[in-house]
Amino acid sequence: ISIIYKFITGSIPPKKELKDLPFRLQKINQNTINDSKSTNFHSLKFAICEASKIFKDFALILLGNPKKEGFKEIEISNPALVVICGKHKDEIFRCVKHENKVLCENLSLAIKEIKKANIKNILFSPGYPSGDDYINFEERGKAFSKLIERNFGT
């Protein structure tokens, strides 16, 4: 692309710095990844793969409305624990195949459940649109980051 740019303009293209997207695999502390932007199975699968490279053992938090994904059954194998929370938790629970999954009413209780299970690493990659729990992924991501800071620090 830079050769084409130079040919057309006669100059070298300016360097562009890529910025991390907020809430897209955002590491908020040594043990926590906030991937609130994950609103579908493909982004969830990618996040699990990336978290598996960073953490030996981790908990995954799922949250949102599975309707957009067609209530598709998904098999999740890597996390030690899958915590499903929010207003659509029962629907998500039926969609997810995992040997160790639990239900929680909300994000705050999900974090407490992970602490109780003594799992140090957390991947928050909801896998679904926000649904009735949050306005959008940004509000959801901010809420998660605040809860992590309150419970673990940064």
Model-derived segments and spans:
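Short, glycine/charged-enriched secondary-structure capping and boundary segments
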Residues: 47-49, 73-76, 96-98, 136-140
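C-terminal helical cap/extension that packs against the catalytic core
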Residues: 66-121
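Short glycine-rich anion-binding loops that position phosphate/pyrophosphate groups of nucleotides
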Residues: 39, 65-67, 88, 123-132
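Residue-level preference for the first positions of well-ordered beta-strands
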Residues: 57-59, 119-123
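Glycine/aspartate-rich loop-and-adjacent alpha/beta segment that forms the canonical ThDP
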Residues: 126-154
